[in-house]
Amino acid sequence: MIGRLRQLVDCESPSTSARHLEECASLIEPWLSSALHRPAEVTRVGENAHLVARAPDPRVLVLGHFDTVWPVGTVSDWPFSIDESVRIGRGPGIFDMKAGIVQALTAIESLPDPDRVSVLLTSDEEVGSATSRALIAELAQDAGAVVVCEPSADGGAVKVGRKGIANYVVEVTGRAAHAGLEPHLGVNASVELAHQIIRITGIGDSNRETSVVPTLASAGTTANTVPEFARVHVDARSWTITELERVDAAMHRLTAQLPGAVVDVVGGIERPPFEEAVARTLYAEAAAVAESLGIGPLAAVRSGGGSDGNLTAALGIPTLDGLGAVGGHPHAWNEHVLIDRMPERAALLGGLLARTTGRSRVR
């Protein structure tokens, strides 16, 4: 496992570099083909290379991604390493989610007959899964159950729900004027944006844990000009599709407050919520496996972050997420995994795959 992990972490694969993604897919392909005893293939959608292995008789889809948020060149300064004093592995993308891929390979290798296991490793999850969504839906529907090898929650908890995500850009157009000579002739886009930000913040509902957060904002061109243009990005998240649709409708109802200003809202729901009921059956199976391995009880949490599990859960397909590595701090310079937990996580996934493929379709 460690040899593969070292190679995979040191094989840079930022979401924005087609060449590096292709190289990473080519690294994983022979490992996956060997584990499954059948060929995996690199499938290209646009410039993105995804790794696909379709089962002859699918019962479960192992879903993950090999793209990372780390730019080319990061490995030169921060290559894979293990701190032997605490048995912690470090490196770009190790927790999210290259260790999860290595564990999945080991889990599949433990199966006497993997002919009911499909695998999809995508290359665009970190940037919204635009080119892989159709593949995800197709393979998930064929299999009827999905296990997602994204990182675990704290302590190794699996994820049985995730908030849905909507993203927006609110653009304001006013009228430029000299800030000192003729401010009264302008329509201040910054002031209009301030009104909109207050209204946007009010769309959230803390009682329902629905967050609507203005994030990146910009306005104006020079310090002595009434701003003609302004914009703000908005991140919205909710546990239920009903709430997310309410937010979406409210965002698209925003109207200008200043005479002469124009407000345009671009965006919408990107990842529907992963609602907890969809995970119930697979979580019960995983918890039973954990007990049989002596690593129970298996904790379960809901997460505010999204994954491709949102997409399969929204289709009503039984889905369990967070079956990847135990560690912490994804997307940060202290990203790490607990090396000594990797074998047990592979065993947990292997046991779950064995139970899932050894019976009729999960309901």
Role assignments for model-derived ranges:
Residues 97-165, 205, 363:
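Acidic/histidine-rich catalytic neighborhood of metal-dependent amide-processing enzymes
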Residues 13, 70, 151-152, 160, ...:
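Metal-dependent amide/peptide-bond hydrolase catalytic core
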Residues 1-92:
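Acidic/His- and Gly-rich active-site-bordering loop/insert found
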